[in-house]
Amino acid sequence: MPTSSTTGHASPAAEAWRLIHQLIASQRGRFLAVATELDLSPAQIMALQMLEPGHPVAMSALATALGCDNSNVTGIIDRLQDRGLVTRRSGDHDRRVKMLDVTPAGAQLRAQLLARLYDTVPAPLARLSPAEQTALRDLLRRALDSPSP
């Protein structure tokens, strides 16, 4: 059954959101192929993307960024730590806070991951002109830089 979002009666913002979601969903196979190639779970990929080498992050902050609870992140980090990709230590000012950092091996794998995910432009975006790609990038940056309501 058609809905307002498929018949053109949705607001421009709702239609844009639906199209962004559709674009992301169209790349799921690519994401899973990279996960398989690098022997990482999708959750490990998301975590590794968010951990920048040399910039330790509190495990609770990573949990918030991933939209899950600390116990889920503990399992994700356990597996990354077992592979020598991240380190975990107590916080300098509060020993209850667990800080995460990327190891040199993790930084190398992270670089491979980012290259495989982002160096090749997906076909739907490659079809846009350079000016359209720039406009889309600028609009998305503006949307993401805006404070949440």
Give a label for each model feature.
Residues R28-G29, D78-R141:
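Charged, amphipathic alpha-helical coiled-coil/dimerization segments
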Residues M1-S11, A131-P149:
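C-terminal regulatory/oligomerization modules of transcriptional regulators
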